[in-house]
Amino acid sequence: MDQYDVAIIGSGPGGYVAAIRCAQLGMKTAIIEKYSTLGGTCLNVGCIPSKAMLDSSHHYEDATKHFEEHGIEIPGEIKVNLEKMIARKQSVVDQTTKGIEFLMDKNKITVYEGIGSFKDATHINIKKNDGKTEEIEAKNIIIATGSKPSTLPFITLDKERVITSTEALKLKEIPKHMIVIGGGVIGLELGQVYKRLGAEVTVVEYMDRIIPGMDAALSKELTKVMKKQKVKFALSHKVKSVERKGDQVIIKADDKKGQEVVFEGDYCLVAVGRKPYTDGLNADAAGVKFDERGKVIVDEHLKTSADNIYAIGDVIKGAMLAHKAEEEGTLVAEILAGQKPHIDYNLIPGVVYTWPEVAAVGKTEEELKEAGVEYKAGQFPMRALGRARASMDIDGFVKILADKKTDEVLGVHMIGARCADLIAEAVTAMEFRASAEDISRMSHAHPTYAEAVKEAALAATDNRALHV
């Protein structure tokens, strides 16, 4: 029987990063993955392929709507080749997953393909695709099995017309009318992809606003921008049935007045979040306990109820984000090596990769009000930037929330071009407990989108933004 210092079940961003860090720290490491490719949801059917589709569809939209204004004239009709677009997406996925294989080899990590299940707290059975079972032993084990799309109890996912994000990334045709159930990150990103390609898109959301977990100002601005892009929204609608009839899908929902509303389309994307994936893990055999939501219970060091077993990523509490899982994977590896790492969960940024992009870190205005914290806010519009006007990306703003007395930055919320990258500046500043004045006095290159961060900091510092 092969023996290891650490075995990791699941090869998503949390699992493979944990494996690499463990190996770097001198531990004999194994990783177990049930699929034939490494990388988990993120690399195979999540973050990476959805960004590939977002970029491809963005190019198409620019070519059909914006090139002429830039003085670029393309003779003839511009067409979408969806098959080729999806093939390119798959090539990006293939390159990325092969890159993870390379990293496993480079770091001398043993990879097992199959379903890993606990025999006890130190032994894992690996059921391979050919039906054979192999057993390994590990001093420490990390559960990194991730999540899968959630649904509603009354919805039957046929994966043809009533689909999840996985199927939405490999459709054979552009929908005529895609109805998206859920106004969160996944629904909005994939809804925007197919809207750009020519589909009619209607987003049906139970809450009274989209991206409800983010600052209300971001929700309001993104709604306004996406309505301008002709995406339709049915907010405060409670879906009660989804029925397929041939090539049509009929969705019935009650609006906020309790009146029934019927939506008809040829595809329904169910994007109501994700849930922990622990099927077949047999965690009870190792003494691992779960909460009422099916998440693995861990302490502040991410240790489970079993002394040598840890859990990271989507299977435990907190935001279901790839970069959160990566930080947790690194943290556990370093704890096992006797180090004292830390994660500030308040400083894990959240991003929506629509265009304009939406990004945030720290506290929202709603959270500060609820906690009774006295704060000041500074906001700066993207349209006031020369760089934004040059690129025609004028939607959005940057908002900085700072403590009224100390000026420490408590939250940064932004929507606009390249905000997914800009948010890193805010994370860095907040990690070092910067004040709004600190950011306002840093030189930002001109002309850039990042100048909006400086200007918002100026606005939060005695309301002295320069360019509005």
Where do the protein language model's features map onto the residues?
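Beta1/beta-strand and adjacent pyrophosphate-binding region of the FAD-binding site
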Residues: M1-G12, I174-G184
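Short hydrophobic core segments
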Residues: A7-I9, G116, E135-G146, I181, ...
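N-terminal Rossmann-fold NAD(P) dinucleotide-binding loop
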Residues: G15, G187-L188
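FAD-site-proximal beta/loop scaffold in flavoenzymes
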Residues: I155-P175, V262-L336, S440
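Glycine-rich flavin
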Residues: M1-Y4, I20-I174, T202, M207-I211, ...
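Gly/Ala-rich phosphate-binding loop of Rossmann-like dinucleotide-binding domains
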Residues: A19, A23, G191, K195-R196
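Flexible, glycine-rich terminal cap/loop adjacent to redox cofactors
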Residues: A7-G14, A18-Y35, I48, M53-H59, ...
